[in-house]
Amino acid sequence: AMLVGRCFAQATGSDLALVSLSTWIPGNPTDQNHHGVAAKLYAKDITDYDLSVILPTGWNRTIQTVSLTGQQISDLLASGYDAYGNGKGYPYVLVSPVQPETGKTYQVAICGVSDQLAAETTVTDSGVVGMDAAKAFFGAYTTISRADTAWS
């Protein structure tokens, strides 16, 4: 989630990213969050298929952005991505080079926008295809380690 968030934020010129996780949550209508990071990368050559599996955008969907205050970001981190409006939110991971300040507004690359959030803010289609962003981002590395998740 950290690498995907950094990739999506940098590709869209966003200040930070909120990436929802595709964890199983009892009581939700489907077994999976289709707007979240769904897998891990392992020590091996990474293929386009590997990227399509982990990316919330799959093969061809674009990255969404929103403008949020630090307080809204904090609230979303506490509640998660409530995909079904039932209060059972998929957790968000914050990927940011700085700790968001409560009163400041940030452009956020976001993976998982609930109906409530969409009603409260403007969701923008960045026009950047997630797979294209991932190929450019991951293609810059010959190897990837946990240290590469750092964004400063």
Give each language-model segment a name.
Residues 1-152:
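Catalytic centers of hydrolytic enzymes
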